[in-house]
A protein has these predicted regions:
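Hydrophobic transmembrane signal anchors and adjacent membrane-proximal interface regions, especially
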Residues: 6-8, 12, 67, 89, ...
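Intrinsically disordered, low-complexity coil segments
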Residues: 16, 87-93, 168-174
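Compositionally biased, intrinsically disordered low-complexity regions enriched in proline and serine
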Residues: 15, 24, 49, 92, ...
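Mixed-charge, glycine-accented linear interaction segment located at domain edges/termini
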Residues: 135-203
């Protein structure tokens, strides 16, 4: 069993009402290069008896950082992830352009995030749909290198703060992550779209 691929980040706008969490206005960003989740958890609290550990209160998840590398971010994706405003600028002889503005009013929205891992298990491809339930992305760094005789492909990386969802019901209590396995990438993507509100309009 091994991981052999990664594809298709999906995002959805997070809504909480009295512990009922929903996602709307989902967006599919079609390309992923890599992702990494770094976690912070509480300390383990072992109980010793007879000179050995007989019980252990394992530290629980408290927060995390998602690092997502993609081929690039379009203006639409940047606006969605970072809560940017659009303004229309005029230049030349009555020409106009739409600009994204980073200013004091910029506030990144709370989102759900999903991605698809491709695994090979006993010579068969399986697809793991991973969902982080509550993420807030920060403004990514800007960097670029001029083109020479040979193209040096450059990517874009963004980091997001992971926290526990507000969702509480008979099945879950403040989940921060879930995953499901599928036989095809198409089914994994359909699952992520359904869970993260792609095609569902928010109020």
């Amino acid at each position: 069993m091994a991981i052999k691929g990664l594809s298709i980040p999906v995002f959805g706008r997070y809504h909480n009402k009295d512990g009922v969490v929903t996602y709307t206005d989902g967006m599919v960003n079609p390309h992923a290069v890599s992702y990494q989740i770094s976690l912070t958890a509480g300390d383990n609290n072992p109980f010793y008896a007879d000179n050995r550990i007989v019980e252990n209160d394992v530290g629980m998840f408290s927060s995390g950082i998602l690092k997502l590398e993609t081929d690039d971010f379009t203006a639409e994706t940047s606006k969605y992830l970072l809560g940017l405003k659009e303004v229309t600028r005029t230049y030349g002889e009555s020409k106009t352009a739409t600009s994204l503005v980073y200013d004091d009013t910029q506030k990144s929205p709370v989102l759900g995030y999903g991605i698809i891992e491709e695994h090979q298990i006993n010579e068969v491809n399986k697809y793991k749909a991973v969902i982080l339930k509550k993420v807030v992305f920060g403004i990514p760094e800007d960097a670029a290198t001029t083109r020479g005789e040979k193209i040096d492909w450059q990517t874009k990386t963004i980091e997001g703060a992971i926290s526990r969802s507000d969702e509480v019901n008979d099945e879950v209590s403040h989940p921060w992550k879930e995953d499901a396995w599928f036989d095809s990438e198409a089914e994994a993507l359909a699952f992520l779209k359904a869970m993260l509100g792609v095609g569902v309009k928010g109020q």
